[in-house]
Amino acid sequence: MTIYLVRHGKDDDTFRGGWSNHGLLPIGIKQVYALAKEIAITNIHVDCIYSSDIQRAAEMAEILSNCLGCPIEYVPKLREVDNGILAGMENNLADERYPGLYWSTLDYDECYTNGESPEMFYNRIKAAWLGLKNRRLKQTTKDALLVTHGGVIEAILCVENNVLFSNKTRHFSAPNAKLIPIEIS
């Protein structure tokens, strides 16, 4: 069985992401339709789409669900990092109000104000991912799709490849609207 990880389509990067609720840009929507076409052409069959409930991922999941004819299950625990007060803030305003505050500048156990730390994020994603994998293995042998975020995919790939997760270094690439297959057994 395969679970295909996919990062949401292009969103507006002039805002801080995290738990923001900005949707996809028009180019991001085009990326989603192109991915749906690619899935159909390559004869990939999924019986379920799991998705973060944050707007940019949920919007992608809804389009894919309509194109592929399969249900969506929203998984809030597979959201991007909770960046607290920075969520959805314009980058220039965030830089002005909170100079030098970035994901990569946090200590591993340091939380965003009203948010979570890299350690909390990784532990949340690891637990949610392992739970989803175990549930799939018990219920079905069919493939599935997980629509989520770059940071979530990074954490999952660290789990799957036994790589030490860090907010200081990115180990894997997760381009917008590209499938990343994970074989589950």
Where do the protein language model's features map onto the residues?
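Glycine-rich phosphate-binding loop signature in dinucleotide/nucleotide-binding domains
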Residues: 42-45, 132-142
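Short active-site segment of divalent metal-dependent hydrolases/proteases
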Residues: 11, 152-153
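General small-molecule cofactor/ligand-binding pocket signal
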Residues: 4, 73-75, 183
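Short beta-strand scaffold positions
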Residues: 51-52, 123, 147-148
